[in-house]
């Protein structure tokens, strides 16, 4: 849709490097509170809507106070709720912190990682992701227009978008 920008990159990694541990994680705006939140689950690699319908108790959220941003204790809480310990716990706290910093830094509307994998050597990797940029913030990021892939957009989208319209934005 309007303002969504996608860039794809395919990376092949040997399957034996991974344990069977997959997680779901996303950063998005909680429209009911007007605050960003991290939504996460131990049920990665699955359709998150199906998980929400059948086992909602397996989906957690962590709301971010815009005055102070994501705090270290929140990253640790997420790693704890995912059942991690030791090196994997530390790696997940770094991953969550970096994920939120990236989301916040590019004016994203959504960062969704599904699955997030814990490897057999306790590394945390984003395997598949979806990033949606906030269309209202594109005027601050003129360089994002080059990343736009119209093949990824919904052809039935009724909203008109042209680069001229974005250039004429007077906000």
Where are these regions (language model features)?
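Cap/lid and interdomain-hinge subdomains that line or gate substrate/regulatory clefts
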Residues: 47-88
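A generic alpha-helix structural signal
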Residues: 79, 92-100, 162
């Amino acid at each position: 849709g309007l303002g969504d920008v996608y860039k794809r990159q395919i990376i092949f990694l040997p399957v034996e490097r991974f344990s069977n541990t997959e997680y779901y994680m996303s950063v998005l705006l909680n429209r009911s509170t007007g605050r960003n939140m991290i939504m996460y689950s131990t049920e990665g690699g699955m359709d998150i809507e199906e998980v929400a319908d059948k086992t909602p108790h397996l989906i957690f959220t962590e709301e971010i106070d815009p005055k102070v941003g994501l705090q270290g204790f929140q990253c640790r809480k997420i790693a704890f709720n995912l059942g991690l310990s030791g090196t994997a716990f530390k790696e997940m706290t770094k991953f969550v912190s970096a994920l939120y910093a990236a989301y916040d830094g590019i004016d994203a509307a959504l960062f969704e990682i599904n699955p997030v994998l814990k490897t057999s050597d306790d590394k945390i990797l984003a395997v598949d992701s979806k990033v949606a940029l906030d269309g209202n913030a594109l005027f601050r990021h003129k360089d994002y227009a080059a990343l736009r892939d119209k093949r990824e957009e919904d052809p039935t989208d009724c909203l008109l978008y042209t680069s001229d319209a974005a250039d004429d934005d007077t906000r």
